[in-house]
Regions:
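Signature of the chorismate-utilizing enzyme
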Residues: 1-146
C-alpha cells in the first residue's frame, strides 16, 4: 500500500510548538520532536505527532518485519514538506542489540516488563516551521495499489 499525503499550510503566528503539543498531549501515544543542527542551532521544523492507537505488532524477527512494513508502506515525497511526514515512531530498547550483534544472540533473553521494540504508526502530524511561523497539518491515508 502506498501512503497518500494530504496537507494544509496555515499561519502559526502567535503559537509556539510546545503550546500546540500540549493541546494534543497523550502521554503514551503522541510525541514532540525538536530538530537541532550541529547540536546547538535550532533547525527549521518542530514535529508534533498527534495521538494514535495504531501500533506495529512484531514477532520473532522484528527487524525483518520492520523492513517489510517500511517497504510496503512507502510515502510519496512532496516538495515543500519536511522529509518526515509520518511513519513509524517509537523506541528500541538497549536489549535490541542482541538482534544485531551475532555474538550476543546466545545470551539469555532477559524478562522485560516493557516491549523490547515499540513502534506506533504516526499518520497525523503537525509540523511547525520555525523560520516561516507556519503550520503544516499532515494526514496520511492509504490507497490500495491493486
Amino acid at each position: 500500500m502506498k501512503r497518500k499525503v494530504f496537507f494544509k499550510n496555515i499561519s502559526g503566528e502567535g503559537l509556539s510548538p510546545l503550546e500546540i503539543y500540549l493541546k494534543f498531549l497523550d502521554e503514551n501515544n503522541s510525541y514532540f520532536f525538536e530538530s537541532v543542527e550541529g547540536g546547538e542551532k535550532w533547525a527549521k521544523y518542530s514535529i508534533i505527532g498527534l495521538p494514535t492507537k495504531n501500533k506495529i505488532n512484531l514477532g520473532n524477527n522484528p527487524l525483518d518485519e520492520i523492513d517489510a512494513f517500511m517497504e510496503s508502506h512507502q510515502t510519496e515525497k512532496i516538495d515543500g514538506l519536511p522529509d518526515f511526514s509520518g511513519g513509524l515512531v517509537g523506541f528500541f530498547s538497549y536489549d535490541t542489540i542482541r538482534l544485531i550483534e551475532n555474538r550476543l544472540r546466545v545470551s539469555k533473553k532477559p524478562k522485560l516488563d516493557y516491549d523490547e521494540i515499540s513502534l506506533m504508526i504516526s499518520n497525523e502530524i503537525i509540523v511547525y516551521d520555525n523560520y516561516e511561523k507556519s503550520l503544516f497539518i499532515i494526514v496520511n491515508d492509504y490507497e490500495n495499489n491493486e
